[in-house]
Amino acid sequence: MARQIKRAANKKKKTAPTGVAHIQSTFNNTIVTITTVTGETVSWASSGAIGFKGAKKGTPFAAQIAAEKASKEAMSQGMKKAEVLVNGPGAGRETAVRALQAAGLEITLIRDITPVPHNGCRPPKKRRV
């Protein structure tokens, strides 16, 4: 007979009512991480973790689904308000912010923290299709 493995049920922690939503949007993927003000991760989701593969991970729709999933999980743990920090040049930036708002999180601040070089590294060569 196969022995049953005993698993501890995931404990739902009650978090602070305010937090920070970090949206990292690259050309290939979008990662949404919701943390407390002190920086402890409450929930996260990414386009790839949801099940999108290849070029579909970089789409605005994939970013929307990822943001909805992360915000629902954070709200189930007691979060109500969030600041939004957006990072990166990807297509899913605005869509992810709208999805957080539509899911019911009250957004208090939107800040773009994309690093801009003072003429640093040479950019990749232009694509010839």
Curated annotation (Swiss-Prot):
Keyword presence, Iron: no
Domain of life: Eukaryota
Keyword Ribosomal protein: yes
Compartments (UniProt record): Plastid, Chloroplast
GO BP terms: translation
GO CC annotation, single: chloroplast
Assembly and oligomerization: Part of the 30S ribosomal subunit.
Family: Belongs to the universal ribosomal protein uS11 family.
Protein name per the record: Small ribosomal subunit protein uS11c
Species annotation: Rhodomonas salina (Cryptomonas salina)
